[in-house]
Amino acid sequence: MAKLPIISKLFPSCRWKVTALIVCGVLVGSGGLFMYLLRAHTYLGDDPAACVNCHIMAPYYATWMHSSHSRDATCNDCHVPHENMVKKWMFKGMDGMKHVGAFLTKSEPQAIQAEEASAQVIMNNCIRCHTQLTNDFVDVGRIDYMMTLIGDGKACWDCHRDVPHGGMNSL
């Protein structure tokens, strides 16, 4: 019994299947090797050493390493939101893509400044970790970063300028 022409067109030949399988294997393997060489897997955890995969972060890592925060806080403890996992991973992914874009286009600034969204996250995390201190002593816990932008208070780093990264001149 001869094959029906419609069946021949719907199901590719064995040679085509093998070729497609090899090409897909090479693409997936190359992509996996590329991601491994970029150390992409290090960004899935909270290890601060991942932040120095990019050379521009080395001075910030070094100053954090010599600060009191290095004993108790990772980069993600301060720089990533902790309200829920979705918000954390979305922020981490978007921020990471901005960093990759700046790195690939060589447009990263000499001295990194937190953008408004990052500053909001950082201040929220200062308040989250230092809740008793901020509520009992300085009333900072009752304001947020957006209020500081309109003059209704100060951001934590307005007074604590060298926390946790210290003076860059001290390196």
PLM regions: where:
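Short sequence/structural segments immediately N-terminal
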Residues: A2-L171
